[in-house]
Design a protein with these regions (language model features):
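Glycine-centered flexibility sites
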Residues: 53, 151-152, 166, 172
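Proline-rich intrinsically disordered, low-complexity coils
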Residues: 4-6, 128, 136
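Extended Gly/Ser/Thr-rich low-complexity repeat segments
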Residues: 48-63, 112-134, 167
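Extracellular beta-strand solenoids
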Residues: 42, 135-137, 143, 156-158, ...
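Extracellular beta-strand-rich solenoid/capping regions of secreted or surface-exposed proteins
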Residues: 87, 117-131, 143-161
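Autoprocessing Asn-cyclization modules and mimics
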Residues: 2-90, 96-110, 140-150
């Protein structure tokens, strides 16, 4: 997707006040999205709480090919033999969202730059747009834990100063 023009600061300044604050919302893709598409379709679009001008991240969470036959040390992990699209992501602006059908129309872009599959657990993450971000000592920002279809990502767009004395934790 061509770089969207974010509505800088549309989510205002943000200051964390406790441990474990969540700033993102998530929805899994319900249909594959291919290079050039200007829409993505998700399950439970209303959970994203999207509006025109929001930023989203489309990210492929799984789908790599792993060779477990190469494991000789007793661990459960194999060698990645083909990443396929696992880990690919892009940021896009939202032109419109239909919460009934789950269709999100991307904002004036030339379409997606990558392919994303529902079987590979691609998801859409709402990316808040802050003027400033302050995470004081004793506070933290975290994301939903990865549940096999969504979560596991923390993402923010900050226009100005970021103060990080606390933590941003994506380990859940």
């Amino acid at each position: 997707v061509s770089r969207p023009t974010p509505l800088v600061g549309m989510d205002a300044a943000y200051k964390a006040t406790k441990v474990g604050e969540k700033v993102n919302t998530y929805a899994p893709l319900s249909a594959n999205a291919k290079t050039g598409d200007t829409t993505v379709t998700v399950t439970n679009a209303g959970n994203l709480k999207l509006a025109k001008g929001d930023l989203i991240m489309v990210i492929q969470m799984q789908g790599a090919e792993v060779d477990f036959a190469s494991v000789t040390d007793g661990t459960k992990y194999g060698a990645v033999s083909n990443y396929r699209n696992a880990g690919l992501y892009e940021i896009a602006g939202v032109a419109a969202v239909d919460n009934n059908t789950g269709v999100i129309t991307l904002d004036g872009c030339g379409g997606l730059k990558n392919n994303y599959t529902a079987a590979g657990h691609a998801q859409v993450v709402r990316v808040p747009q802050y003027t400033t971000l302050d995470v004081p000592t004793g506070t933290s920002i975290t994301g939903d834990a990865w549940d096999g279809s969504k979560g596991g990502v923390v993402a923010m767009y900050v226009q100005g100063k970021t103060s990080l004395a606390g933590k941003i934790d994506a380990s859940a």
